């Protein structure tokens, strides 16, 4: 009697390989999506770096009593009639706005609005504020007086803690409620 040696993959081996690939994909895809969201949020925060620099320089060099209106820091907040920023700092950011400054040294908070309407990041806003001390929460942050140094910037999500996992670690500790 002659024995027949089978060559190649059997159907069972192929099915096992498909199951293994499916399990790996089920684990890897959510982790990849979280990494993509973190990268998107980080890019938006980096995109407003020049705005942070401009606000810092203005605070450190403006004479006492200077009044700066809402969106008056020169960060590209000019909006058209539809309240859409004319200057888009990145492909993920629809607009950037800033709060007014007053003689008491309040204001200069940057708000970043995301452009993604079909994403879980839709309607996410991030706030960043200059502080006169090394703090990590908005409640403890006060804008430095004009002529003083900006010691730190605090940042966090606005009115939400739901999506804080996508914020950089330096922004997760605080939530700006307004």
Where is each model-derived feature located?
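N-terminal single-pass transmembrane signal-anchor helix
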Residues: 1-51
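Generic hydrophobic/packing signal
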Residues: 13-22, 54-57, 114, 120, ...
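Membrane-proximal N-terminal amphipathic helix
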Residues: 34-66, 72-80
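Periplasmic/extracellular, small/polar-rich flexible segments of pilin-like filament-forming proteins
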Residues: 60-178
């Amino acid at each position: 009697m002659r024995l027949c040696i089978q060559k190649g993959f059997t159907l069972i081996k192929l099915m096992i390989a498909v199951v293994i690939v499916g399990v790996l994909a089920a684990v890897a895809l959510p982790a990849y999506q979280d990494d993509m969201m973190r990268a998107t949020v980080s890019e938006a925060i980096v995109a407003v770096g020049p705005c942070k620099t401009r606000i810092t320089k203005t605070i450190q060099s403006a004479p006492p009593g200077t009044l700066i209106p809402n969106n008056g820091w020169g960060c590209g907040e000019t909006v058209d009639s539809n309240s859409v920023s004319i200057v888009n700092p990145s492909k993920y950011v629809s607009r950037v706005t800033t709060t007014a400054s007053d003689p008491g040294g309040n204001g200069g908070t940057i708000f970043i609005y995301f452009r993604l309407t079909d994403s879980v990041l839709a309607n996410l806003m991030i706030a960043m504020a200059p502080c006169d001390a090394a703090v990590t929460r908005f409640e403890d942050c006060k804008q430095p007086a004009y002529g003083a140094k900006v010691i730190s910037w605090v940042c966090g999500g606005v009115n939400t803690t739901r999506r804080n996992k996508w914020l950089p670690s330096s922004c997760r500790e605080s939530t700006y409620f307004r």
